[in-house]
Amino acid sequence: MLKWKWVALALVTSALSANAEESSKEKFLNNYGRMLAVEARCPSWKINQQKVVEILNSFKIANADIEPGGHDWPAIERSIHSNQRAFAGIGPKMMCVKANAMYGPKGAVSPGLMEPK
């Protein structure tokens, strides 16, 4: 009986770990879409591609998956559109301030994912 409890515990732990990883992946995809929306409106900041590649590798996401038509593109596209609406009234100068605050070297959301051009 004890053996089955350990098997059940292992299955639950494995499922929770997979859910946490998927949750982190979804957060990254959402942030990536937001960064694309920010980058389109801010002329002085760009996405730090080196950091993005590191994250893609950690989640085992292929570059093609985050391009239009790719496996993960729908989640990114939803984030882009949502953030474009949210940022509609924000000018380029303020958008660059937000880029730094969210994704710059000391960013509150994900530090280092954007850098000055």
What are the residue ranges of the model-derived segments?
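Acidic, low-complexity intrinsically disordered regions
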Residues: 1-2, 41, 69
